[in-house]
């Protein structure tokens, strides 16, 4: 099986431990980005995955490409920018007790934001692909990325390749712009929608909050509403319950419109080490198990367990293997 993801690669910088961003004498670095995180997680779950992006032709771009190669991700379709391009950055200040986690983006004018949508040969990229995954972050980054994304989804649909869209609402990237005019047309073309109630409300305009997933009946109602409005075959919604400063309840639901099957996962109580990448690892594991032919309920339980494991390790990438996830499921 082969999957393809498309989005921006970022360099993440974080202070160690619980230190504050501008009060620490050092910053730890790693690479990330929603779609890159999905590609890495898929690779570790045994799915061959190619990642499509654009990075600068400089040492930071070189390091990013090499980091992906080390994780087993295909980098053939990564374009290189000119000498004046830059790699997008983001800074993460871990939260502690009453202090919430803080994220600061520095990605305006990046090599990816300046992407020429006509520079990607999507028929060649998607030839032989069994799945195509994107996120709602890309449309916020500029006209080039959103045009490339629309062209990619159109190409995938024409080829009969399943498309998943993780809504991934990032308020700071939209800068008070309304995301709905860009996101809703993409959502109507994606066969699988992934997100949480906050993203559903902000990006698709449906009334949804934490209470929407509080009972199976409410969760199913929201999923059916999403499926009917956007003609999606599957709806996956994650739920994060804050039980303490670093204690979270983590669960999800999955609705299959073709069979009208609805599944609700068990709730994992997780001591969170790093919450970044949790949703991405959920998306990756769900894709991996649907590609493997699992029934929706089994695929959902696997995805929730895999993403719960990701919450226990630092950094953006999930390196959980199938065996590790299955061991957790047996526990």
Name every feature range the model reports, one short phrase each.
Residues 51, 163-165, 193:
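Hydrophobic faces of well-ordered beta-strands that scaffold small-molecule active sites
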Residues 159, 173-258:
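Conserved phosphate/ATP/ADP-binding segment of small-molecule kinases
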Residues 9, 167, 281:
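Active-site metal-binding loops of divalent metal-dependent hydrolases
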Residues 262-330:
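Conserved post-catalytic alpha-helical subdomain immediately downstream of the catalytic base
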Residues 5-19, 248-264:
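Acidic-glycine-rich active-site phosphate/pyrophosphate-binding loop
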Residues 108, 137, 168-172, 198, ...:
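Active-site beta-loop-alpha junctions enriched in small/polar residues
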Residues 1-76, 95-98, 115-118, 271-272:
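Glycine-rich phosphate/adenosyl-contacting loop at the front of the ribokinase-like
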Residues 48-137, 326-331:
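Conserved N-terminal subdomain of the carbohydrate kinase-like
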């Amino acid at each position: 099986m082969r999957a393809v993801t498309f989005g921006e690669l970022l360099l993440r910088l974080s202070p160690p431990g619980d230190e504050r961003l501008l009060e620490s004498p050092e910053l730890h670095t790693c690479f990330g980005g929603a779609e890159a995180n999905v590609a890495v997680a898929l690779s570790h779950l045994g799915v061959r995955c190619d990642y499509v992006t654009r990075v600068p032709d400089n040492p930071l771009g070189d390091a990013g490409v090499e980091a992906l190669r080390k994780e087993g991700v295909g980098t053939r379709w990564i374009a290189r920018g000119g000498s004046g391009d830059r790699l997008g950055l983001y800074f993460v200040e871990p939260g502690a007790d009453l202090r919430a986690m803080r994220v600061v983006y520095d990605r305006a004018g990046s090599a990816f934001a300046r992407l020429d949508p006509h520079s990607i040969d999507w028929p060649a990229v998607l030839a032989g692909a069994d799945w195509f995954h994107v996120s709602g972050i890309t449309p916020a980054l500029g006209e080039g990325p959103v045009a490339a994304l629309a062209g990619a989804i159109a190409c995938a649909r024409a080829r009969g390749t399943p498309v998943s869209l993780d809504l991934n609402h990032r308020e700071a990237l939209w800068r008070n712009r309304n995301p709905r005019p860009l996101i809703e047309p993409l959502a109507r073309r994606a066969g699988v929608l992934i997100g949480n109630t906050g993203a559903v409300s902000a990006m698709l305009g449906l009334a949804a909050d934490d209470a929407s997933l509080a009972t199976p009946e409410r969760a199913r109602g929201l999923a059916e509403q999403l499926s009917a409005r956007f003609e999606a075959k599957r709806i996956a919604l994650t739920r994060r319950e804050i039980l303490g400063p670093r204690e979270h309840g983590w669960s999800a639901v999955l609705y299959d419109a073709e069979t009208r099957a609805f599944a609700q996962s068990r709730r994992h109580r997780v001591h969170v080490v790093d919450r970044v990448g949790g949703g991405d690892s959920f998306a990756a594991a769900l894709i991996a198990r649907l590609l493997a032919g699992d029934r929706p309920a089994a695929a959902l339980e696997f995805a929730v367990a895999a993403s719960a494991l990701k919450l226990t390790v630092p950094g953006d990438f999930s390196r959980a293997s199938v065996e590790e996830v299955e061991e957790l499921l047996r526990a």
